[in-house]
């Protein structure tokens, strides 16, 4: 078994309650990056399109999905962090997120550029007209996993953050993507402390309403 999933292997099998959140990442590179800033929070690699989401434990305080994403809103630049206030999935489903503004404030405290808005999950990389359609519907960024993770939350609080790599003016299939990806990885590695402070406030009940 990969070391990326070891922290939860025993807890997930035995359903040992976890007092804090579980962080989910699609890719190992994302998991390794976010883990650098975490001191006590387990990270699970759920795979492309969350194909291994079944390994997520059912007994934890919250599910947090993190990683790289694409901007739909031109106001989001590469390296910015989009904190979802809702996660939109296929068929018009939408999962509200817990205390997104509080999480954004904690990220900003650490010197990161964070904004709040809807995140949409698609089943493929979107470009051109598809991006424009999603943006017109109010979504600010896109990924391929968060809604699938949220669907398994079973009533647990959910949060999602995506570090922007590409966008309307920064196409994914471009030589500059390599540099933007490396920069995004550095940003993702700095999100851990804010995530853990946010989770403490959430457990204490200081989160306020979902849109707060």
Feature map (PLM): residue ranges:
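Glycine-/acidic-rich phosphate or pyrophosphate-binding loops and their flanking alpha/beta elements
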Residues: 12-13
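Glycine-rich phosphate- or other oxyanion-binding loops that anchor nucleotides, phosphorylated ligands
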Residues: 2, 6, 16-212
């Amino acid at each position: 078994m990969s070391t990326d999933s070891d922290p939860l292997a025993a807890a997930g099998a035995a359903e040992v309650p976890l007092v804090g959140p579980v962080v989910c990442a699609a890719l190992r590179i994302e998991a390794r990056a976010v883990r650098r800033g975490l001191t006590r929070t387990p990270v699970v690699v759920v795979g492309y399109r969350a194909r291994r989401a079944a390994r997520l434990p059912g007994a934890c305080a919250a599910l947090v999905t993190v990683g790289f994403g694409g901007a739909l809103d031109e106001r989001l630049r590469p390296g910015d962090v989009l904190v979802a206030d809702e996660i939109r999935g296929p068929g018009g489903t939408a999962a509200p997120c817990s205390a997104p503004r509080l999480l954004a404030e904690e990220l900003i405290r650490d010197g990161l550029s964070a904004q709040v808005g809807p995140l949409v999950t698609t089943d493929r990389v979107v470009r051109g007209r598809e991006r424009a359609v999603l943006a017109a519907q109010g979504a600010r960024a896109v990924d391929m996993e968060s809604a699938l993770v949220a669907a398994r939350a079973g009533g647990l609080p959910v949060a999602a953050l995506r570090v922007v790599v590409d966008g309307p003016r920064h196409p994914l299939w471009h030589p500059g993507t390599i540099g933007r990806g490396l920069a995004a990885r550095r940003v993702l590695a700095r999100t851990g402390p804010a995530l853990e402070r946010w989770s403490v406030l959430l457990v204490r009940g200081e989160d306020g309403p979902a849109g707060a």
